[in-house]
């Protein structure tokens, strides 16, 4: 207590002490304690967590008093770790600790809301039409009425509605759209199911039952690293954060661990007490640098150059000059380095072609099953073998898809030969593309020949067709690509680290600005540690590298380093990519629930990047051409057209999905086929070949082939992840926008070849936008209907993360406040109303669904050699081979509600599975009938019920091997049939363990090891990706079955990326068009625009939270270097404007010496609804970080039908990169709040 009264003569406290002076007797008033107790007393504590995409997945105590949440604190009862590991707790962060503020704040959505103009028209239409579908038609078919409420989007004007009214309007709109245009014109976007998997499943299940389109998120967010599927055939699999503690050398490369992985950062600091060295690699002085022994600051966007130089050192010192036995054995057994590659003859030199296959050779090396998909190598005896494990062994035969060192024909043990040097027939000159001399004036270049000729040892082989071919190994190609001289007098190879040749440390020094001595030192230390510890060197990596256009080059650079050093699959080592809470651990139990696979298959999925690139018409403004992306050795005549042309070709060849799919209502095709006397599949094939049916993507703006209804839930699409924000406003929403640039027609640019061009792009494509949220976000402002959802303390759900092995509950500590409902209850009610409204319009319908060639299915062996396009007459249209699968799905629309609320019969008829393996689920269905009870009548009679979110959670937990030991054993047994090795021992000790929802409410539960992931959870090892591949000899799901360094698909070769290369950031050409055009009298400068993850929010969540705003600056900010700020006359906290041809934004300036000159940082997802004045450029309220971005897709991410390069939802596809973007920065002159309240000001310029 305060002793301020002790200073006065007549006011004295008792001064007696006790306990040797540690205690004191006081007589002060203690009434204050009553207030303290009243504030902090509570009636109960409930366990929950935060369903936000932060990867934390922390367990929290939610304190409830009088039916209200009063506060939250961190739980500390995680299951114990091994004796040699620190505990997982404390887990939490300031953002999570502030969440209870939202529940009763002014930001909270309390009631269903509808745009006033739309409500007025809807009520008038209902008065005239008794049928809700006809009422909706009367509005949306009237162009003036539709335009009037679409143009109001983003301007407020919401009024309170009722659940009955909004559900009826939504259902009527869905029924109208399906009936007139097709179910694939109804779409939904929701990200990261792992953060609240039942809530995600609620909307996805509804959409899938009606045939709607579920949009991807991992690729759209640019969280997906395409290098992972390219190398491992795996979307992403990474170590848990506890495995950091097992490492003895860690590089944190572009990952700001203490800021963006706050709950896990203690492992990073704790491992340093063991002597582990830590290195930070970031262009700015980020918080991670404070926790490290060394900080390297390469120029932003040049990370691949530094990784190449480090790889150069590792290969020189640990593979050539002083070979590590461990490294050599590792790359021989677990990589494609021994595999043979055919060389193609060019003008005076050779180029690396595709991998040699058994089918290329006489008698196919004795392989009868899939010989064109079996890779070939020489063994150390000089014999050619097709070793076990390649993708051809996975499908069509059993028992040889493993990494045992055996000949695939004889089964005899064999050791593969890494290099042909010493046994070659001749030395050949092979060309390698070089891009290090490309780029803009903002990045350093090293001018060399654009085709570098290297000398390689080769052998000449007789092929099955009688011709001969030269071959070399991937190992030899890799050494040459890295510029390593091996006594072959190769003038383009380096003899010293000081040679400025690709890709030496001296070369990288000129590109990155990092000294060659530092590059050499870190590479040497990293590899030496890995050699001595057998792989305990780790790279933690994140969005800093993954958000660039050539992100796969950045990532493959790091992955190659790890592979060269034998780190992948070893505890304490490997690739630790953390961008997004991607790990939905009980995935195989969740998928049937989410996509209604228990009732009908397949679901409609779409990759969001291609979807939004097309339908928000961003392609109309494209400035990047395929020609500038191609290898100098490619035949450019094969790659003509616009970038969207490549996407369209990929769709029709079955590589990528489409949405909408066809240029006609898919519900009408079966009827037309019946009239023609054909089955629907044959009729569709015939119509596509004739051109009477076209892919919708070929005519995106004809008024029929665009999305019409969009659901958004668990997402702030227009306030966080929507790259090309202003284009979405104009073309999807039809409202006010800030686009400054001209489209291709206005520029006189090159028009697409595959897509019909219209001079005026179609605006306002979406008829209805429905958003579910607990707070009024930017997306809500642009919606037509807002539905109030329960917060994370008001609903039951589940949450998992890649950062730890636990599964956490979200629990309803209190009932949803006001009229809010959980996502499950909202979509259940919509499904019920839809089932009523559709009667008379939709009944039992036959839907034609196109499905791209799927990864982890036998169909991925579709196109083994060259790329052939059926539309160009290069091959026939064969569904599932040269084109998408064409599937027939029977839908029962009036039974939608009954199906939504029950588990369908397909789980018993077909079973369940994931990632290429399947198992029987009869016993699990029997258990679910007992747990959830069954439907007593109706279309789902006798099926287990899904009435509540807890019922849905129990379905996930019961069906998933990660939470049901019996299923885990069945899943491992199913995999054992493929590999010929027994893996069930990995789960037998957990066979009787079944995790229930009430179990995880009592305490977090650790998941059970499952074959659908590549790591193990047990007492002996922390989860580490690739562990089962290395230790259980389970192949990676790639062409070779090994870690794939060489990408031999024709597009990868022709775009110059079969091997790792450095590619500088692309030129988006978004600045030259606007700089100096709308001057306000202040200096302007072009700067690179980066959007790292922020400190005071998780994406946009918490960015409007008063507690977080108080800790930060209270609104949007942009960070500038001191040098750039000086040039521009900007002082700290000045209002600035950031703009380019895509749009404009306003923010406060943060001037800091931690930011290097030439770049600016606007921390990602600062809401546009807080403290934001108008833009001088647009005369509108300043935008968000994505107002100055636009998508540019990369053709190599469109590849499909090719083993590991095949489509899977969120697995592979185009990504939404944005860090190559440049903006113009200037100080604002007129600060206009656009509110008429007299707070505007003029900001004086600094001389």
UniProtKB/Swiss-Prot annotation:
Reactions this protein catalyses: nitrate + a quinol = a quinone + nitrite + H2O
In which residues is Mo-bis(molybdopterin guanine dinucleotide) bound? 223
Print the keywords alphabetically: 4Fe-4S, Cell membrane, Electron transport, Iron, Iron-sulfur, Membrane, Metal-binding, Molybdenum, Nitrate assimilation, Oxidoreductase, Transport
Annotated membrane topology is: Peripheral membrane protein
The residues the record assigns to binding [4Fe-4S] cluster are 50, 54, 58, 93
**What are its E.C. numbers?**
1.7.5.1
Assigned protein family: Belongs to the prokaryotic molybdopterin-containing oxidoreductase family.
Describe its function.
Answer: The nitrate reductase enzyme complex allows E.coli to use nitrate as an electron acceptor during anaerobic growth. The alpha chain is the actual site of nitrate reduction.
Q: What is this protein called?
A: Respiratory nitrate reductase 1 alpha chain
Its gene name is: narG
């Amino acid at each position: 207590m305060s002793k301020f009264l002790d200073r006065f003569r007549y006011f004295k406290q008792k001064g007696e002490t006790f306990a040797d002076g540690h205690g004191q007797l006081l007589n002060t008033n203690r009434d204050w304690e009553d207030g303290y107790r009243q504030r902090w007393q509570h009636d109960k504590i409930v366990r929950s967590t935060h369903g936000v995409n932060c990867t934390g997945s922390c367990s929290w105590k939610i304190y409830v008093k009088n039916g209200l949440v009063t506060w939250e604190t961190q739980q500390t009862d995680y299951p114990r770790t091994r004796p040699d590991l620190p505990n997982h707790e404390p887990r939490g962060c300031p953002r999570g600790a502030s969440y209870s503020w939202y529940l009763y704040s002014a930001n909270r959505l309390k009631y269903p809301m509808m745009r006033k103009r739309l409500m007025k028209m809807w009520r008038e239409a209902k008065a005239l039409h008794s049928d809700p579908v006809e009422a909706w038609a009367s509005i949306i078919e009237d162009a003036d009425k539709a335009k009037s409420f679409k143009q109001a989007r983003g301007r407020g004007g919401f009024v309170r509605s009722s659940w009955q009214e909004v559900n009826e309007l939504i259902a009527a709109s869905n029924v109208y759209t399906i009936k007139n245009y097709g179910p694939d014109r109804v779409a939904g976007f929701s990200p990261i199911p792992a953060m609240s998997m039942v809530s995600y499943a609620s909307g996805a299940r509804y959409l899938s039952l009606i045939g709607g389109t579920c949009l991807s998120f991992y690729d759209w967010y640019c969280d997906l690293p395409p290098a992972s599927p390219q190398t491992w055939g795996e979307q992403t699999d990474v170590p848990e954060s506890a495995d950091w503690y097992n490492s003895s050398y860690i590089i944190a490369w572009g990952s700001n661990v203490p800021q963006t992985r706050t709950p896990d950062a203690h492992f990073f600091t704790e491992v340093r007490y063991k002597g582990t060295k830590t290195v930070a690699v970031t262009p700015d002085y980020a918080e991670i640098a404070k926790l490290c022994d060394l900080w390297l600051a390469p120029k932003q966007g040049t990370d691949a150059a530094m990784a190449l130089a480090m790889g150069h050192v590792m290969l020189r010192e640990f593979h050539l000059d002083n070979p590590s036995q461990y490294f050599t054995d590792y790359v021989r057994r677990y990589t494609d380095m021994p595999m043979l590659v055919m060389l193609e003859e060019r003008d005076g030199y050779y180029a690396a072609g595709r991998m040699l296959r058994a089918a290329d050779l006489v008698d196919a090396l004795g392989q009868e099953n899939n010989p064109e998909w079996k890779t070939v190598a020489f063994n150390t005896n000089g014999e050619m073998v097709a070793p076990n494990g390649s993708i051809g062994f996975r499908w069509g035969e059993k028992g040889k898809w493993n990494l045992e060192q055996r000949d695939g024909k004889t089964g005899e043990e064999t050791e593969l030969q890494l290099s042909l040097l010493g046994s070659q027939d001749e030395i050949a000159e092979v060309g390698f593309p070089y891009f290090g001399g490309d780029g803009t004036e903002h990045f350093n270049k090293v001018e060399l020949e654009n085709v570098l000729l290297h000398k390689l040892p080769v052998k000449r082989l007789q092929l099955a067709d009688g011709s001969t071919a030269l071959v070399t190994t991937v190992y030899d190609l890799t050494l040459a690509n890295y510029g390593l001289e091996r006594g072959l007098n190769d003038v383009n190879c380096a003899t010293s680290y000081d040679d400025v040749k690709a890709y030496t440390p001296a070369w990288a020094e000129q590109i990155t600005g990092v000294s060659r001595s530092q590059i050499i030192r870190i590479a040497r230390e990293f590899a030496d540690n890995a050699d001595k510890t057998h792989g305990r060197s780790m790279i933690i990596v994140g969005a800093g590298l993954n958000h660039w256009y050539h992100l796969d080059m950045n990532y493959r650079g790091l992955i190659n380093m790890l592979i060269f050093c034998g780190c992948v699959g070893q505890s304490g080592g490997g690739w630790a990519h953390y961008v997004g809470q991607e790990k939905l651990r009980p995935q195989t139990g969740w998928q049937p629930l989410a996509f209604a696979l228990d009732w009908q298959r397949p679901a409609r999925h779409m990759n969001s990047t291609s979807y939004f690139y097309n339908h928000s018409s961003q392609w109309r403004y494209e400035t990047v051409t395929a020609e500038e992306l191609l290898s100098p050795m490619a035949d450019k005549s094969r790659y003509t057209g616009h970038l969207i042309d490549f996407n369209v070709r990929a769709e029709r060849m079955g590589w990528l999905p489409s949405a909408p799919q066809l240029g006609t209502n898919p519900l009408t095709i079966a009827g037309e086929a019946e009239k023609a006397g054909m089955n629907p599949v044959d009729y569709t094939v015939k119509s596509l070949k004739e051109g009477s049916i076209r892919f919708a993507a070929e005519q995106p703006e004809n008024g029929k082939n665009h999305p019409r209804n969009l659901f958004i839930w668990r997402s702030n699409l227009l306030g966080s992840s929507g790259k090309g924000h202003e284009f979405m406003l104009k073309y999807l929403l039809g409202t006010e926008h800030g686009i400054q640039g001209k489209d291709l027609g206005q520029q006189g640019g090159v028009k697409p070849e595959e897509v019909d061009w219209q001079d005026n792009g179609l605006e306002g494509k979406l008829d209805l936008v429905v958003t579910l949220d607990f707070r009024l976000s930017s997306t809500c402002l642009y919606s037509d209907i807002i539905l109030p959802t329960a917060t994370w303390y008001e609903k039951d759900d589940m949450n998992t993360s890649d950062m730890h092995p636990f599964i956490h509950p979200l629990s309803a500590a209190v009932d949803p406040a006001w009229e809010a409902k959980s996502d499950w209850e909202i979509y259940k009610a919509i499904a019920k109303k839809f089932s009523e409204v559709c009667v008379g319009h939709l009944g039992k319908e036959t839907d034609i669904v196109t499905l791209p060639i799927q990864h982890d299915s036998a169909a991925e062996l579709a196109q083994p050699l060259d790329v052939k396009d059926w539309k160009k007459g290069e091959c026939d249209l064969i569904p599932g081979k040269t084109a998408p699968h064409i599937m027939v799905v029977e839908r029962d629309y009036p039974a939608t509600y009954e199906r939504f609320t029950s588990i369908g019969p397909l789980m018993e008829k077909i079973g369940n599975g994931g990632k290429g393996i399947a198992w029987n689920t009869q016993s699990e269905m029997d258990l679910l009938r007992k747990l959830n009870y069954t439907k007593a009548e109706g279309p789902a009679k006798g099926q287990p019920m899904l009435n509540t979110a807890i019922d849905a959670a129990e379905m996930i937990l019961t069906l998933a091997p990660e939470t049901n030991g019996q299923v885990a054993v069945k899943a491992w047994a199913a995999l054992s049939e493929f590999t010929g090795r027994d893996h069930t021992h990995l789960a037998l000790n957990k066979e009787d363990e079944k995790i229930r929802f009430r179990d995880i409410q009592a305490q977090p539960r650790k998941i059970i090891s499952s074959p659908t992931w590549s790591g193990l959870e047990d007492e002996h090892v922390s989860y580490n990706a690739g562990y089962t591949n290395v230790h259980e000899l389970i192949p990676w799901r790639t062409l070779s079955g090994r870690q794939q360094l060489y990408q031999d698909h024709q597009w990868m070769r022709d775009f110059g990326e079969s091997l790792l290369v450095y590619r500088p950031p692309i030129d988006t050409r978004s600045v030259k068009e606007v700089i100096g055009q709308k001057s306000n009298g202040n200096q302007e400068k072009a700067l690179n625009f980066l959007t790292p993850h922020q400190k005071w929010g998780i994406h946009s969540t918490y960015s409007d939270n008063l507690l977080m705003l108080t800790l930060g600056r209270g609104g949007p900010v942009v960070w500038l270097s001191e040098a750039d700020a000086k040039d521009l006359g900007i002082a700290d906290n000045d209002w600035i404007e950031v703009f380019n041809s895509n749009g404009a934004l306003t923010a406060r300036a943060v001037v800091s010496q931690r930011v290097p000159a030439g770049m600016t940082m606007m921390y990602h997802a600062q809401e546009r609804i807080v403290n934001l004045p108008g833009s001088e450029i647009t005369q509108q309220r300043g935008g968000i970080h994505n107002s100055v971005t636009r998508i540019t897709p990369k053709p190599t991410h469109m590849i499909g039908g090719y083993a590991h390069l095949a489509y899977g939802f969120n697995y592979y596809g185009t990504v939404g990169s944005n860090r190559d973007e440049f903006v113009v920065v200037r100080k604002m002159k007129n600060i206009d709040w656009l509110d008429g309240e007299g707070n505007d000001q003029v900001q004086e310029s600094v001389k």
